[in-house]
């Protein structure tokens, strides 16, 4: 199995000490980051968008500062960048019959991208684990 594509919720939990799953995500990352971890345009953009949103935290970063935090993390020697190199229909082919709502399409794309790279999607989202895709999802709970 290849690298872990980190869902935005994992990236945020790792970077934000006040996040409820910061410690849990940190322990998981310490065990698995040596296997390689990846981001993509979707997860990177979500990271900057959420960390710079005042609704997320009264201590939200500016977009420029959120971008600096992201860039600092991407300098890790075990980080891989996965471009959004597959189409949406190709990415969703393994789960399209299991999707129940419009809010699942990005998660399904991320899962398809991870599978395309022979990796796993690491997430805090329990709903993704219910899609029945076996070992392609690493649920951090």
PLM regions: where:
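Short, well-structured N-terminal submotif of metal-dependent ribonuclease cores
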Residues: 1-39, 51-65
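Charged phosphate-binding loop/patch that engages nucleotide di/tri-phosphates or the phosphate backbone
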Residues: 116, 120-141
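Short, conserved alpha-helical segments within structured domains
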Residues: 39-44, 106
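Alpha-helix capping/helix-boundary segments
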Residues: 10, 43, 87-88, 127-128
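A structural signal for short, well-ordered beta-strand segments and their strand-loop junctions
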Residues: 38-40, 81-82, 121-123, 139
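Active-site neighborhoods of divalent-metal-dependent phosphate/nucleic-acid chemistry enzymes
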Residues: 60, 76-122
């Amino acid at each position: 199995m290849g690298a872990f594509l980190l869902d935005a919720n994992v990236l945020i939990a790792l970077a934000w000490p006040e996040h409820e799953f910061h410690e849990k995500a940190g322990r998981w990352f310490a065990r698995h980051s040596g296997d390689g971890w990846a981001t993509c345009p979707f997860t990177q953009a979500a990271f900057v968008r959420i960390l710079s949103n005042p609704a997320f935290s009264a201590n939200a970063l500016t977009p420029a500062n959120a971008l600096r935090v992201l860039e600092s993390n991407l300098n890790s020697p075990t980080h891989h960048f996965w471009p959004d190199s597959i189409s949406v229909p190709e990415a969703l082919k393994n789960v399209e019959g299991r999707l129940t709502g419009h809010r699942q399409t990005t998660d399904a794309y991320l899962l398809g991208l991870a599978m395309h790279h022979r990796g796993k999607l690491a997430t805090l989202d329990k709903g993704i684990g219910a899609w029945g895709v076996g070992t392609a999802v690493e649920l951090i709970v």
